From Swiss-Prot:
The gene is DIF1. Belongs to the DIF1/spd1 family. Keywords: Cytoplasm, Nucleus. It is found in: Cytoplasm; Nucleus. Mediates the nuclear localization of the ribonucleotide reductase. This is Damage-regulated import facilitator 1.
Amino acid sequence: MDNKRHQTSIGSELSEAQNRLSTVGMRIRQRIDRGYAYSGKNVSGMDDQVPIRDVASTIVPQFRTQVLYEQQQQPQQMHRPAMNGPAPMLVNQRTESSNLDCMQEEMLSNGKRRVF
């Protein structure tokens, strides 16, 4: 009798874990939609009124807003890849597994197509 109760409790725990796992995607989307508002609690200790840009270096130490600012000041020097053609198909063709390498090479050469 005790063994049967133990099996039932294990089964219910497993069922509960499966239910939680099946709803993880929905819970992630809800958190994003709410802007990571954790039920009124401020988990990180930061004020909600502070723009994320002002605390980005605290969250991600490598984050620098100055890089964007410098690029906006000198737009003529920015490299913009030419995206004139469609994206490559991700299928196994010949000896390559995809055409991503060819696309990257094309973008790096300013969109000038090379004849092979």
